[in-house]
């Protein structure tokens, strides 16, 4: 039986590695909710609504995929959405340790929720939202790392800051 999955993240901004995970997951799960977190512990570069709309624009063409913002405990959100799977992406060993710990905690919070991991395509494994923001801040070319709509929005933000 195929289940609905939740792919959570801050997506600040969404990158091509996020899009790769979402695209591949959309062929595995009949419904994939990309959950844009309002993480109060992180100072976001883009406001929540912008992150959500950039993501929606980037994956809107995929069947069975929709973006939803959330600001509560992930396990609670997963259960509210009648999903049973949290999908997480792993780029490197450094991601694994943190994600393994989260998966264990989520399992402890609810036996009804499982965590599954996908790795991105090899040529995307080094991309992170943080690195993209740093490159953009120094006027570097980020077009190979993020969708075109994100490039436009980051350039717009940089231009506003330089005024």
UniProtKB/Swiss-Prot annotation:
The record marks 18 as: Transition state stabilizer. Substrate binds at residues 10, 42, 74, 88. One of its GO terms (biological process) is coenzyme A biosynthetic process. Its EC number is 2.7.7.3. Pathway: Cofactor biosynthesis; coenzyme A biosynthesis; CoA from (R)-pantothenate: step 4/5. It is found in: Cytoplasm. Its cofactor is Mg(2+). One of its GO terms (molecular function) is pantetheine-phosphate adenylyltransferase activity. Keywords: ATP-binding, Coenzyme A biosynthesis, Cytoplasm, Magnesium, Nucleotide-binding, Nucleotidyltransferase, Transferase. Pfam families: CTP_transf_like. GO terms for cellular component: cytoplasm. The keyword Cytoplasm applies. Coiled coil: none annotated. InterPro entries: Cyt_trans-like, PPAT, Rossmann-like_a/b/a_fold. It catalyses: (R)-4'-phosphopantetheine + ATP + H(+) = 3'-dephospho-CoA + diphosphate. NCBIfam families: coaD_prev_kdtB (TIGR01510), cyt_tran_rel (TIGR00125). HAMAP family: PPAT_bact. Reversibly transfers an adenylyl group from ATP to 4'-phosphopantetheine, yielding dephospho-CoA (dPCoA) and pyrophosphate. This is Phosphopantetheine adenylyltransferase. The lineage of its organism: Bacteria, Pseudomonadati, Pseudomonadota, Gammaproteobacteria, Legionellales.
């Amino acid at each position: 039986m195929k289940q609905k999955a939740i792919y959570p993240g801050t997506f600040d901004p969404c990158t091509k590695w996020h899009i790769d995970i979402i695209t591949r997951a959309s062929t595995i799960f009949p419904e994939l909710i990309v959950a844009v977190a309002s993480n109060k512990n992180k100072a976001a570069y883009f406001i929540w609504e912008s992150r959500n709309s950039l993501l929606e624009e980037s994956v809107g063409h995929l069947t069975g995929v929709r973006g939803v913002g959330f600001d509560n405990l992930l396990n609670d959100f997963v259960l509210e959405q009648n999903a049973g799977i949290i999908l997480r992406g792993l780029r490197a060993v450094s991601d694994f340790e943190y994600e393994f710990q989260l998966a264990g905690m989520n399992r402890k919070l609810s036996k009804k929720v499982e965590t599954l991991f996908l790795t991105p395509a090899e040529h995307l494994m080094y991309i992170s939202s943080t690195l993209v923001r740093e490159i953009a801040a120094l006027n570097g070319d980020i077009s190979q790392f993020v969708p075109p709509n994100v490039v436009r929005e980051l350039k717009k933000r940089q231009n506003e800051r330089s005024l």
